[in-house]
Amino acid sequence: MIVFIGVDLGWYGKPTGLAALHYATSALEQHAITRLEPVAEILDWISQQIGGEDAVVGVDAPLVIPNSSGIRRAERELNAEYRRYHAGCHAANLSRPFAPNVLAFSRALSERGFAHGAEASPRQPGRFQIEVHPHSATVALFGLPRIVKYKRGRREDRSRELRRLRRLMLERLPALDPPFVPDLPRIPLSGNLKAVEDQIDAVLCAYIAAHWWKWGRQRNAVFGSNQEGYIVVPKRGAYSPPSCL
């Protein structure tokens, strides 16, 4: 068995969405989903979910930031391909206030035996961490003309888009490879959406990790490198788009 962990990291020390998927034969199974805040609790949760198994941790946050200013090559390359879909990503450099937190999290994973996996081969044994980008991944996996815009705006609009993302995941992920039937939280009719959003994002991060482990560069793109910073995204065109977006 191999375990895939999705981490929608709270960049500024805020709560983090977490998901754990297990792959034993030919399909993924969702094992756990939660939201935690203290980094020590997050790392303990990851260790408990993995036990003694091999694992890939997909993190929606910069894990390698060598540049003191400007933008990483990974972001420049991703933006060149995905900005037209409104899926570009923000610049990461050492002067950004989130840098200490995200780099400390990556170091903690490294200390626990998780090597950076941008150069790993498909189905390679071991434990790896990879940086992922859910927005561009949904464009690629679901054949979307634009991202699902559930991050900003009025609650009504965000709720509608989050429901759309949930529906796409429920309908499309079982038909992909590896197939996966997610168990996603329902979107609340009122109140804050952030907790549900973080957990759904974490499931996406875990699925991207599984997709990378199974297919490597055959069906995934790697922007950047282990040394300069990297982002793993499924390749566009690997799967047919849904009949109704």
Describe each model-derived feature in a short phrase:
Residues 1-5, 9-245:
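RNase H-like (RuvC/DEDD) metal-dependent nuclease/polynucleotide-processing core
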